[in-house]
Amino acid sequence: MEQAPEDQGPQREPYNEWTLELLEELKSEAVRHFPRIWLHSLEQYIYETYGDTWEGVEAIIRILQQLLFIHFRIGCQHSRIGITRQRRARNGASRS
């Protein structure tokens, strides 16, 4: 007879606890890089759109992740991640 495999993996914390911890980490990181008024407006928009639901929590997590990714990719002054802006040589020596 076939049997379902036993769950031998590590104990995982519940999804809602993990999600709320992730949201708090993203919010604390976002406050370092964006004006508080922007973040407050974003939270207000999410609350008006989704109310106090898990969909709203997931939406704000997704938006904050995207904002932070783009912010770092463009080149945050506080981060080593991002596009390195190279100075162009005036004599054109760097052209190939």
Curated annotation (Swiss-Prot):
Homooligomerization: annotated span: 1-42
Gene3D superfamilies for the chain: 6.10.210.10, VpR/VpX protein, C-terminal domain
Post-translational modification: Phosphorylated on several residues by host. These phosphorylations regulate VPR activity for the nuclear import of the HIV-1 pre-integration complex.
Modified residues (Phosphoserine): 79, 94, 96
GO cellular component: host cell; host cell nucleus; host extracellular space; virion component
Biological process annotations from GO: DNA-templated transcription; monoatomic ion transmembrane transport; protein homooligomerization; regulation of DNA-templated transcription; symbiont entry into host cell; symbiont-mediated activation of host apoptosis; symbiont-mediated arrest of host cell cycle during G2/M transition; viral penetration into host nucleus
Domain of life: Viruses
Keyword list, A-Z: Activator, AIDS, Apoptosis, Cell cycle, Host G2/M cell cycle arrest by virus, Host nucleus, Host-virus interaction, Ion channel, Ion transport, Modulation of host cell cycle by virus, Phosphoprotein, Transcription, Transcription regulation, Transport, Viral penetration into host nucleus, Virion, Virus entry into host cell
Signal peptide positions (record): none
Xref: HAMAP family: HIV_VPR (MF_04080)
Family the UniProt entry places it in: Belongs to the HIV-1 VPR protein family.
Note from the entry: HIV-1 lineages are divided in three main groups, M (for Major), O (for Outlier), and N (for New, or Non-M, Non-O). The vast majority of strains found worldwide belong to the group M. Group O seems to be endemic to and largely confined to Cameroon and neighboring countries in West Central Africa, where these viruses represent a small minority of HIV-1 strains. The group N is represented by a limited number of isolates from Cameroonian persons. The group M is further subdivided in 9 clades or subtypes (A to D, F to H, J and K).
Oligomeric form and interacting partners: Homooligomer, may form homodimer. Interacts with p6-gag region of the Pr55 Gag precursor protein through a (Leu-X-X)4 motif near the C-terminus of the P6gag protein. Interacts with host UNG. May interact with host RAD23A/HHR23A. Interacts with host VPRBP/DCAF1, leading to hijack the CUL4A-RBX1-DDB1-DCAF1/VPRBP complex, mediating ubiquitination of host proteins such as TERT and ZGPAT and arrest of the cell cycle in G2 phase.
Function: During virus replication, may deplete host UNG protein, and incude G2-M cell cycle arrest. Acts by targeting specific host proteins for degradation by the 26S proteasome, through association with the cellular CUL4A-DDB1 E3 ligase complex by direct interaction with host VPRPB/DCAF-1. Cell cycle arrest reportedly occurs within hours of infection and is not blocked by antiviral agents, suggesting that it is initiated by the VPR carried into the virion. Additionally, VPR induces apoptosis in a cell cycle dependent manner suggesting that these two effects are mechanistically linked.
Protein name in UniProt: Protein Vpr
Lineage: Viruses, Riboviria, Pararnavirae, Artverviricota, Revtraviricetes
